[in-house]
A protein has these predicted regions:
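Short, structured segments at the rim of ligand-binding sites
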Residues: 1-413
Length: 413
């Protein structure tokens, strides 16, 4: 519970999305790479272990990772945990190996959408047994590539996973997305951007079609930006408690969807402005409802829904049907938890409606989902007696979340 207005400067750890993309590219590169300010979390550690299993040498120092690529080789057993990036980015890498590579993860991971990854590898001539986790790739040491059509409606990670590895396919790859919707387009732009910085040209043939020629992926030294999606709960805190929160080292240009918080929080009543190298949000404690299509930035939904539950007017969030296949069914989880503490939330076919209500304390369940935990923390700033079931699930992408949260609350104005 925030006892008074906040005045805090927060340094957020590195971006998970960027860390895991750069790790994959470093493992596939023609020479060594160094990643500065990488995220140290369960998801990034699972990625490191997976790439080590496939032959890469990865040495970690306190603020960097040094990656020396080696031939991708099996046999190996890959633990995906609950990390979508591991389960969807590593199989195309493993397909380049000779031998059997088996994949499994947490029990909850077995229900996450994986069929598109498996089907796409089969369509490229890779032998795969199983249709979702657990499954095994029987690699021959090369992937021919060519043209491929997939339906990535459930996750843009299906597209990114193939694009990251495509330059190592014998004939490169022309990839077409055939589904009606393509969520989280900025994540694909991020993938294309990381490839370009390593000397690879991705031709965007259309909004849903990409081409990569075979070629060398160069090693590089790269500094990882702070994770702007993880900055969201801290920025939201300024709107809930009043006061100012500044996120340090906010990038001047970025492909991260978390950058959308700048415009979203302004719409909900925050004053958002650049402050030197940081981004500051000032709030009064009064929150406006919002009508917004979050199809390109679905992972921001839990923060926006938490603010909506505390807002003075109705909110409608749309374009996020794909959240049903995240760490948990996030739409159902958000509605259930908001309503369990006296809120008025309803699920729609592709989102949520949240209406103003008097909230009361109670248990906020986390469903093993880091973003459900941080959504509960936001509501707990204003509503006395909110108990977060398991705050440790935040370590999936942000170890030390609760320490930083308490430090922010200690820094009152």
């Amino acid at each position: 519970l925030a006892k008074s207005a906040i005045s805090a400067q927060i340094s957020i750890p590195g971006s998970k999305s960027l860390t895991n993309r750069e790790l994959v590219l470093s493992a596939l590169a023609s020479g060594p790479s160094e990643i500065l300010n990488p995220l140290d979390s369960r998801d990034s550690n699972l990625m490191i272990q997976a790439l080590k299993q496939l032959g890469s040498e990865i040495e970690s120092t306190p603020n960097s990772l040094r990656i020396t690529p080696r031939p991708i080789s099996g046999p190996a057993q890959i633990d995906c945990g609950l990390a979508g990036t591991v389960m969807r980015f590593v199989p195309p890498v493993a397909a380049l190996a000779k031998g059997e590579i088996s994949f499994d993860g947490d029990v909850a991971a077995r229900s996450r959408p994986m069929k598109t990854t498996v089907d796409s590898l089969r369509a490229l001539g890779v032998e795969v047994s199983g249709s979702g986790l657990p499954f095994t790739i029987h690699g021959t040491g090369e992937v021919v590539g060519g043209e491929l059509s997939i339906d990535a409606s459930e996750s843009s990670q299906f597209v990114s996973g193939l694009l990251l590895v495509a330059a190592r396919f014998k004939n490169g790859l022309t990839l077409n997305h055939t589904g009606k919707t393509l969520p989280s387009m900025p994540h694909i732009d991020m993938t294309i951007d990381t490839l370009a910085k390593r000397g690879l040209k991705v031709s965007k043939l259309s909004e849903t079609s990409w081409q990569i020629e075979p070629g060398e992926i160069s090693g590089r030294t790269v500094e990882i930006e702070p994770d702007l999606s993880n900055a969201g709960p801290f920025m939201a805190a300024a709107l809930v408690a009043g006061g100012t929160v500044t996120i340090e080292n906010w990038p001047t240009s970025t492909t991260q969807v978390g950058n959308d918080f700048v415009s979203l929080l302004a719409l909900m009543g925050g004053q958002v402005s650049r402050n030197g190298t940081g981004m500051s949000v000032t709030g009064t404690g009064e929150i406006n409802g919002i009508e917004i299509d979050l199809s390109s930035a679905g992972e921001l939904t839990p923060v926006i829904a938490a603010l909506a539950a505390l807002a003075k007017s109705k909110s409608v969030i749309s374009g996020v049907a794909h959240l049903r296949g995240h760490e948990t069914d996030r739409l159902k989880a958000l509605v259930d938890e908001i309503n369990s503490i006296g809120g008025r939330a309803t699920e729609t076919k592709d989102g949520l409606i949240v209406e103003p209500a008097d909230l009361r304390g109670g248990l906020w369940k986390t469903y093993g989902d880091h973003r459900m935990a941080t959504a509960g923390a936001i509501i707990g700033l204003r509503v006395p007696g909110i108990e977060i079931e398991d705050i440790t699930v935040t370590s999936k992408t942000m170890p030390g979340f609760e320490l930083l949260w308490n430090k922010m609350l200690g820094a009152t104005s």
